[in-house]
Amino acid sequence: MLGFRSPIRLCKLSALGSAPLLPISRPKLFSTAVARYAADMETVNTTERLARLRQLMQEHKVDVYIVPSEDSHQSEYIAPCDGRREFISGFSGSAGTAIVSMTKAALSTDGRYFNQASKQLDSNWELLKRGVENVPTWQEWTTEQAEGGKVVGVDPSLITASGARSLEETLKRNGSSLVGISQNLVDLVWGKDRPAPPREKVRVHPDKFAGKTFQEKIADLRKELEKKKTAGFVISMLDEIAWLFNLRGSDIPYNPVFFAYAIITPTKAELYIDDDKITPEVVAHLGQDVVIKPYNSIFADAKALSEARKQEAGETASKFLLSNKASWALSLSLGGEEHVEETRSPIADAKAIKNEVELAGMRACHIRDGAALIEYFAWLENELVNKKTVLDEVDAADKLERIRTKHDLFAGLSFDTISSTGPNGAVIHYKPEKGTCSIIDPDAIYLCDSGAQYLDGTTDVTRTFHFGKPTELEKKAFTLVLKGLIAIDTAVFPKGTSGFALDALARQYLWKEGLDYLHGTGHGIGSYLNVHEGPIGIGTRVQYTEVPIAPGNVISDEPGFYEDGKFGIRIENVIMAREVQTTHKFGDKPWLGFEHVTMAPIGRNLIQPSLLSDLELKWVNDYHAEVWDKTHHFFENDEFTRSWLQRETAPITK
């Protein structure tokens, strides 16, 4: 699935001599209990909503109001009740910030969503294309609107402490100010139509899948806190809490997390969660090691904890550790910048390095998931080509989900399946909706980006097929993308190398043609957790320079190419970083490489063998032989699918 983006300028393709436009993505059921939460691409009339919001802004003496995408835990993907930015703007993409002044409104988003936002925003809104030359950032636009001593308001629980400080400093320079408004104004506009917060039960994630008890994880965390000489760690990121306590939930579609906070000190472990989500199994699991407290008491408790610490030790009191992604509201409750140490979360770092049990689970679940994909693509080709069945993009995506449910340890989808035909493949984060989506054209490129949650791991795979006769242009573009995927897969690099440094390997063959793609090359992946997981990744984000790739990291490898209005190409495998043996060891340091775990054929009729080196062609044939070896036993009683797999994994020659 497409992860994080790169600030690259858009351009058109002409006979593979210029450059491309956007990529794609579509969300789906996290479990059968979760209804689809997606809007179609139609424009939403926001006139009345904006009028009501501006009335509330006047009442609260605010001239400009910021509406972030995130929830109180800074989640990338959110529950329906937290879709405030979508409600006020009509834009349903996962990333973006809305800003409303008394006379104007703007929506800032990145290159994955330019196409979508331009279709969904009505005439009340200005689209700020992030990363495009001469287009202001949302902070710059806000500052301009606030000139002359105006007041900018924001819900302090929805913006990071560092983000608030940075904006506050910028506003001060032109005589303006930033204020936190605890009552969210968009919620007031939304009123009774706002979806209710989720109330799903929390589940224990067994140690046989986690590979480590939660007591061991907390002990390791306390060692880190001792090294940093901090008073404790206040945790707000949902996937970090789920990972730390070996618990899973269903509060956010596709992400097995639950709304909670936690505080870990040298002597206490406290979990803040609504009582109605706790089962006897969870109580028994946590035992005497964890105190369960009400979710809404976190801010009062954090304030009391900070004040008690100051009274005991005065000005020499050690600070509380807080993630640099934690909210402004949480930072203020701990006494603000002077009393907290904001840093990259030590839990994020630990979670990103999978243990041997988690790595084994990743290998196993990707083989089962590969079998599901093989059955699906064999079925799809047969329906489209042989039976001439009329299928739309949602029909196909639903079939894939049904196939996945048959496999062991399946627990839902990891994101909404991106099932896209022809030009829809060139739309970043494309969302097909029943009634408005396209009929799949067997004579056009079909791009499918999908993933699943299994109790032993999380999958994310993209395959691009053509069930007819692809053009030479399509084959050349596909092969250039494939060469980039192979370059990452076969990379060998010294310990300490970042994903930022590796990114160019995937783009080099497109760059030689003057081409590129508007998204990162890879993102971290959780173990039965979020399909997008930091802090590691492969791309041009500054954050990727901060954390080097390490053994145990699980990352996607997904270069692409997109010709707006025509087709999209992306090939995605999940890879795991590991130590490799090299002839030499320059600098006497370990050297790393990758192990791929995704097991699904790569569209062979789109490959132009003459563009592959001998080593690249060997990689393709070796990979397909591995796919056959690890998956063909699933089809002992399914001769049709077995024959399709045999054909698709047969050796390719020049």
From Swiss-Prot:
It holds the Pfam family Peptidase_M24. It is an enzyme of class 3 (hydrolase). One of its GO terms (cellular component) is cytoplasm. Keywords: Aminopeptidase, Hydrolase, Manganese, Metal-binding, Metalloprotease, Protease. GO terms for biological process: proteolysis. Mn(2+) 2 binds at residues 449, 460, 572. Mn(2+) 1 binds at residues 460, 558, 572. The keyword Plastid does not apply. Its cofactor is Mn(2+). Its EC number is 3.4.11.9. Binds 2 manganese ions per subunit. CDD domains: APP. It catalyses: Release of any N-terminal amino acid, including proline, that is linked to proline, even from a dipeptide or tripeptide. Belongs to the peptidase M24B family. Catalyzes the removal of a penultimate prolyl residue from the N-termini of peptides. This is Probable Xaa-Pro aminopeptidase P.
